[in-house]
C-alpha cells in the first residue's frame, strides 16, 4: 500500500519526514513526485475547499497541473499521459472522475467536440472555440468576436442558460 511504501522510503532515507507529512506528496508505485511550494499547495487546498472538494493527493496533483493560471485544453487521455510522463501513476478513471468533479465545481469547462470526445478548458470565462479536426486541437475565440444575428424563440417554460459556439476547421487545400 501507499502508506507502507512511504514508510519504507522514510526508513531508507529517500524522502525526509517533513515532506512525507505534506499531504500533497504524490506517492504512486515507486515514484515520488516533488510537491509544489507550501504557498502553492495552500492555495490549491483553499481553491478545492472553496468549491466543496476535499484535497486528496490525486486532486492536488491534477490541480497543480491545471489550476496554475495557464489557459490550456486537455483531454483525459492527454492529461493521463502528461502525469505518467512525469513519473507518476494515476488511473485513467481517476483522471476522468477528477476532471468531471472539477468541471461540476466550476474549476474547468467541458467542451464536447464530437459525440464522445470532450476536452477540458482551464479558461472558465465566457468564450468560444475553433476546433481543428485534423490536429484534434481547440483554439479560443474571444466572446466579443462572435456576433449572433438571431436566436430562435426558446420553447415555453425554458430560459437560455448559455450559448457556446464551436467552429470546426481544417487546413486550407489548394
Regions found by a protein language model. Name each.
Residues 53, 68-72, 86:
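Short helix-capping/hinge SLiMs at alpha-helix to coil transitions
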Residues 75-88:
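DNA-recognition alpha helix
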Residues 31-61:
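Short alpha-helical segments that sit at the start of domains
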Residues 105-174:
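Non-DNA-binding regulatory cores of transcription-related proteins
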Residues 47, 64-69, 82:
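Short amphipathic alpha-helical elements of helix-turn-helix/winged-helix folds
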